Regions:
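A cross-kingdom marker of C-terminal helix-rich interaction/assembly modules
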Residues: 1-119, 123, 130, 137, ...
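Short, flexible/disordered secondary-structure transition segments
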Residues: 164, 168, 209-212
């Protein structure tokens, strides 16, 4: 079988616009939103919200609105410390650089003679839109939603791994991505632990209740994205980026010459223990630990 592979590159390519959007944040309500610098003081942000509310309520002053409701606002606010923005930007650059490098690799491969390779290539290539969605969600502090999509990437990589060597349509499309993890772990050994981590975070379990439930002025407040999830999200996106690149190198090992994520050990290709992710992730995680300490002592 020989088939031309066409890529709709411009529609999904990750761009620098994500860098720009992270320098700003939207605040407001269901009627009005405004865009402000991300490092704006909390008091200023609350004053803007109070002004919006007062306007629609017909009040001449924001004072009564601020006094009555401001305790409810930004209870789950993202930290405005510079280290958090820098950490995010470092994670963003790492993900973008690696994902775009491997998108180029997929686009230029010449391996269209086996059906399994064709569908694996397509499945992995289309994940670029999933990566972009994750980064955009992270820029809006939607950490749980970001980790949900990280799990989608894990499942899709697992499926691509299980079908790339297949030659017949019925063998490929009868495989459920949810049933591929066991085989995938034979290559990407951290997959099981990562899947468990993501599942525990994205499902609201009873033991997690204190993380998203707060009581203020004797009223119960639900927070949708506790700030602690940010660090879990960084870990998740770094991990699935490593998984994505490693999976591509392994599946298409017969068609590429340079390897950064896998290496040949005896007669088999295995994860390269000294790959960039291992060292870079430790650097990012150190930054994250510093951020956590700053949060605790703020």
């Amino acid at each position: 079988m020989n088939m031309d592979f066409v890529f709709d590159e411009e529609r999904f390519r990750i761009t620098d616009s994500i860098d720009q959007t992270y320098n700003y944040k939207k605040i407001g309500d269901f009627q009005t939103e405004v865009l402000i610098p991300r490092n704006s003081p909390i008091r200023l942000q609350k004053n803007i919200i109070a002004a919006i509310k007062a306007y629609y309520l017909g009040y001449k002053s924001i004072d009564s609105v601020y006094k009555k409701y401001s305790d409810y606002w930004f209870i789950d606010s993202d930290s405005l410390e510079e280290i958090n923005i820098n950490t995010y930007m470092n994670v963003l650059d790492y993900v973008k650089n690696n994902v775009n490098t491997f998108l180029d690799l997929l686009q230029n491969l010449d391996c269209n003679e086996k059906l399994g390779l064709i569908v694996s290539r397509a499945a992995l290539y289309r994940l670029q839109s999933t990566f972009k969605s994750i980064l955009l969600l992270m820029s809006r502090n939607q950490y749980l939603e970001s980790m949900n999509l990280c799990r989608v990437i894990l499942e899709q990589c697992s499926w691509a791994f299980c079908v790339y060597a297949k030659e017949h349509e019925e063998d490929i499309f009868s495989i459920n991505p949810l049933n591929c993890l066991k085989d995938f772990k034979t290559f990407y050994t951290p997959a099981g632990r990562l899947y468990g981590f993501l599942s525990n975070r994205v499902h609201i379990s009873p033991e997690l209740t204190p993380e998203y439930l707060q009581i203020i002025n004797n009223e119960i407040i639900v927070t949708f994205n506790p700030i602690s999830y940010r660090y879990d999200c960084y870990y998740s996106i770094l991990s699935v980026t490593d998984m994505y690149c490693s999976t591509i190198e392994y599946i298409f090992r017969d068609f590429i010459n340079k390897f950064d994520f896998v290496n040949k050990y005896e007669k088999e290709f295995v994860l390269f223990k000294e790959r960039e992710f291992v060292t870079q992730a430790n650097i990012f995680l150190d930054d994250i630990r510093n951020s956590i300490n700053n949060e605790i002592h703020r």
